[in-house]
Amino acid sequence: MQTLNDIRSTFLSYFEKQGHSVVASSPLVPRNDPTLMFANSGMVQFKNLFTGVETRAYKRATTAQKCVRAGGKHNDLDNVGYTARHHTFFEMLGNFSFGDYFKEDAIPFAWDLVTRELGIDKSRLYVTIYHTDEEAAAIWKKVGVPEDRIIPIATNDNFWMMGPTGPCGPCTEIFYDHGDHIWGGPPGSPEEDGDRFVEIWNLVFMQYEQFEDGTRRDLAAQSIDTGMGIERVAALLQGTNDNYATDLMRSLIEASADASNTDPDGPCKTHHRVIADHLRSTSFLMADGVMPSNDGRGYVLRRIMRRAMRHAHLLGAKDPLMHQLVPALVQQMGAAYPELGQAQSMIIQTLLQEETRFKQTLERGLKLLDDELSALGEGDDLPGAAAFKLYDTYGFPLDLTQDALREKGRGVDTDGFDAAMAAQKAKARAAWSGTGEAADAAIWFDVADAQGTTDFLGYDTEVAEGQIVALVQGGTATQTAKAGETVQIALNQTPFYAESGGQVGDTGVIKTANGVANVTDCRKTADVFVHMAKVTEGALSVGEAAQLTVDPARRTAIRANHSATHLLHEALREALGDHVAQRGSLNAEDRLRFDFSHTQALSHEELARVEADVNAYIRQNAPVETRIMTPDAARELGAQALFGEKYGDEVRVVSMGRKEGSGKGLSGDTYSLELCGGTHVRQTGDIGAFVTLGDSASSAGVRRIEALTGAAALQHLRAQDQRLAAVAADLKAQLADVPERVRSLLEERRALSNEVAQLRRELAMSGGGGSAAPDVKDVAGTPFMAQVLSGVTGKDLPGLVDQMKEQMGSGVVLLIADADGKAAVAAGVTKDLTAKLSAVDIVKASVAALGGKGGGGRPDMAQGGAKDAANADAAIAAAETVLKG
């Protein structure tokens, strides 16, 4: 049997032999493409190559691309688990040509691989072509496909377009016939939606460029983009038409069944399929840097998680289930995707945390759903307001509610739901709409085309000469910028670092023979370094030579913070575990901030250890070295790459610190080794000192450490010393004695507080704390004592209630404390009466009479509160009503 891993290997090896570069899958989060939620096809990472914006060293490429379809236009979530072929996560195998070969090679490659390498029966294969693509039809005949199995299609299903304008072209598709025991007809027939004929490979011929007026012209460089769904091919090679019966999916389904002690098939079949599919998408999304949250990509991830968790609940799983299945996934897919194994610990922790949290509300939410349904007529849809309440109160995404109702044959009033959510949706749309930067950025692509990209000189110098190649004001190119005007400046080369990788952009001065500009920031678009500046003297013009000077003191501080971030990252991994991975950073001149994957707050001891380790490697004063190499070579040396980051053919590797036996670096003794394009100190000692300001939560599963280095760290320590000295002076103690003196004062305060509380209770018991000492009255045969007290707090009441119960022997006590107008209520029932009376009921009635809500406790002791104690008599009367039954 050819496993899914075998098929992937066969595909990539075949095209490598045909001169293709094997390119690693891009992350699921598309880089620099806010228009796309997740990568959903193999061509996503090559988009700029097809449009000509970018060039690479290769003209032919092959990939196995991770894809997710859940959310937005491409959304398969609702169907997953209920059909044989829908997935939220899938792999797309593809081969690509960027102006190299075209149809005459692409079609024979596809036929040869499918029939000879994979061994698929030719008699079961059909192909479709675009109805006017006679060239493709002729090539298919030439490779041996009978004419009656070449099906012309006139619809857009066989014509691909990148957008309203731009590259486009016809498609040809290969279909597999599963046999007449399955309903369905060939493509183009009325029965084409059946499952008998399944598309396994789509070849797109990027042949034309379409213009706004609808006309098309031949592209100068014609390209190939193909996509083969590996799950579908695995199914047919393993003798099934069900993707979930393939080796990989079956292993995950059986892991789910084992963990839940249920049958993998039968009534539980759908639940296991949902869990198996969603395990893949959630794990790979987290491995690529997406963490569960309440907006954007993180919200889509949380929706997928919660859908799987509901199905785990339906299996009867009492404990969190999803995290138990991660090792089975890593075993199956970790070799092909190493990032999955690297993130395994973090994925397990995050899934456990999310499922534990969600289980607390899931049962209550499902009960609310059942209550709402029981109030409806037979077959009625759930009102939108109720669906929104499930979303707003219990965190049920709409699709999870729809999924639950689907099993009951019900639907949801989605219009009502949308109306209830209008405000949130408007806010979300505003957040996603951006600020117009995309339109402003277009001009820099034109600059890159006309003038080339910017050469960065700043690794080696902070002063350089360059030539102004473009000036932009208000999104429009200009030839001159005058004193007092703000302007964006592009040069052929620059020492100014452009903001990226968490490091802020440089500031400084640009000076020409005719003018001076202060640079306030530097950013990068289309590999053009854009200097944000204000002209302070004279004027600047395109074509002028310029003297470029980076603010040296600011750059020095930024270097120190960025290098300290690398040491901090490694120290955290050693202190907390390999699951720690960078989730974000800020390397500014005055501070650094580092976000990392970890699910709980650091203890004081852990934070102290991390700080000490960083300072130890600073004192080591080891050289900071950089090398240029391929990403694969860097990873072989043990370099840390950022989750979700896509690297080019060459990367810059920064190493610092020495640690015997680390196994990293060329000599196997490097402490920190990371892929990084930022600027760094020359020796770790240049950082000076490192002081943490604390640890906080950044988002779910992500912690944040803020810290200072160098002079800022020393200033912080001096300020701390001054504060401590001031405390010592107030305490009239030596600095070394301050902790003991503070502990002694706290003990004295605690003893005095206890003494005051005891005196208040004694005063209250004697009748001096409010109304006179109460008499015991008979209410419906039950001894009842009630009193309103002042000078006591709610914390005092339980002790007073117990004392009064003991004095009474048998009966009920109600105490109301009036503290600055607010009411604290406590009630007690002696043990002999708790079978028929509950202190909880008495407190709730009294609190309600005072205008409050709630109250709780045990049958023999309960407490509550309200904002106003003025209606104490009504509260006592309400308690008597409870006693009377």
Curated annotation (Swiss-Prot):
UniProt cofactor(s): Zn(2+)
Q: Give the enzyme's EC designation.
A: 6.1.1.7
Q: What is its main location?
A: cytoplasm
Establish whether keyword Transmembrane is in the entry. Answer: no
This protein's GO cellular component annotations are:
cytosol
Q: Which residues bind Zn(2+)?
A: 562, 566, 676, 680
Please give the biological process terms from Gene Ontology that the record holds.
alanyl-tRNA aminoacylation; negative regulation of DNA-templated transcription
Top EC class, one word: ligase
The reactions it catalyses are: tRNA(Ala) + L-alanine + ATP = L-alanyl-tRNA(Ala) + AMP + diphosphate
**Cofactor comment:** Binds 1 zinc ion per subunit.
Q: Which keywords does this Swiss-Prot/TrEMBL entry list?
A: Aminoacyl-tRNA synthetase, ATP-binding, Cytoplasm, Ligase, Metal-binding, Nucleotide-binding, Protein biosynthesis, RNA-binding, tRNA-binding, Zinc
Mind telling me which Pfam families this protein's record contains? DHHA1, tRNA-synt_2c, tRNA_SAD
**Where in the cell is the protein located?**
Cytoplasm
Q: Name any one GO molecular function.
A: zinc ion binding
Q: What is known of its domains?
A: Consists of three domains; the N-terminal catalytic domain, the editing domain and the C-terminal C-Ala domain. The editing domain removes incorrectly charged amino acids, while the C-Ala domain, along with tRNA(Ala), serves as a bridge to cooperatively bring together the editing and aminoacylation centers thus stimulating deacylation of misacylated tRNAs.
Its annotated function is as follows: Catalyzes the attachment of alanine to tRNA(Ala) in a two-step reaction: alanine is first activated by ATP to form Ala-AMP and then transferred to the acceptor end of tRNA(Ala). Also edits incorrectly charged Ser-tRNA(Ala) and Gly-tRNA(Ala) via its editing domain.
**Family of the protein in this entry:** Belongs to the class-II aminoacyl-tRNA synthetase family.
Alphabetized HAMAP family for the sequence: Ala_tRNA_synth_B
Name recorded for this polypeptide: Alanine--tRNA ligase
* Annotated source species: Roseobacter denitrificans (strain ATCC 33942 / OCh 114) (Erythrobacter sp. (strain OCh 114))
